[in-house]
Every structure is written in C-alpha cells, then in structure tokens.
Design a protein with these regions (language model features):
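A general structural signal for well-ordered alpha-helical segments in protein cores
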Residues: 8, 29, 75, 135, ...
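Crotonase-fold acyl-CoA enzyme core
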Residues: 83-155
C-alpha cells in the first residue's frame, strides 16, 4: 500500500492506493507509522510523504474498515508518530487532501503544495463533529478565524 525509497538522507513514502485515491484504512495507517519509525531508526534526516496518481489522500476509505473498531486509534497513532518524529516530515501534496488526508498534511512539519491540490474537512457537511486534535492543529497553523471558516463552511 506504500512505496518507500531513499535518496541519501531523504526517505520518500508514496501512498499507493491509486484506485481508492490513496484513501486511508487501518493497514495503510500502520504502514505509514512503521515507515516513519524505520526512517528514524535508519538515521534518515528528512521524510517526504506523497500520493501516487492525481490525489494526495482522499481521506478515510469509507468502503473499507474505517467503521471497524481500532481504525480511529490507528489513525491517531499514525498522526502522533508523524508529529513526534525527530526528523522533519514534509507532505508533498500533489492533489486533493480530503478529511483524514488533510489531517495527514496537518501532522507534517511542512507542506509543499501543487497547483492542483486542495484541502477539505467535510465533517460538518456530513453532520460529524471534527475531533479536537484537528481543530487545535489547524488553528495553530492558520489562526483561529480562518480555521473556524474552514470548519463551518465544511471546506
């Protein structure tokens, strides 16, 4: 589900679920977390996360196991691992980053964004509240007012 390459001190992780627009499921969350841990253990100096195809990450795979017990824990653990990584993690956002895909970019230290990229947190449109981590992280990055606009407009 992921491809890992290394060029010198740079490890690149490519999400490879192009048929699902790189949507996250439990297995992908575990693989990303393990890739971060391995890059750190192998003395990488930086990690880049990107998506194969035209999408960075379409969010949680709603046709998969995201409703199963344990998915949200796997997602939270992956995000925490990225945030706490002692090396810079760069999200190379090559296309849409929706829902959990936006969370993946928020967990990263830097975001390099292609002109075709867009971000969305559609939870409000679905009648679902946004988790506290996402609200705090987005507000810390772009400010409270703009973050409220994103959440209230479900953009």
């Amino acid at each position: 589900m992921i491809g890992i390459s290394r060029d010198g001190d740079v490890v690149t992780v490519e999400l490879q679920r192009e048929e699902r627009r790189n949507a996250l499921n439990t297995q992908l969350c575990v693989e990303i977390r393990e890739a971060v841990d391995k890059a750190v253990a192998d003395d990488a100096r930086v990690m880049v996360i990107t998506g194969r195809g035209s999408s960075f990450c379409a969010g949680a795979d709603l046709s998969g196991d995201v409703y199963a017990e344990g998915f949200t824990d796997s997602l939270a653990e992956m995000l925490r691992t990225i945030v706490e990584a002692p090396i810079p993690v760069i999200a190379a956002v090559n296309g849409p980053a929706i829902g959990a895909g936006t969370q993946l970019t928020l967990a990263s230290d830097l975001r390099v964004v292609a002109p075709t990229a867009r971000f969305s947190v559609p939870a409000a449109r679905l009648g679902i509240s946004v988790d506290r981590w996402t609200v705090r992280r987005l507000a810390s990055l772009i400010g409270g007012g703009p973050a409220r606009a994103v959440f209230l407009a479900a953009e």
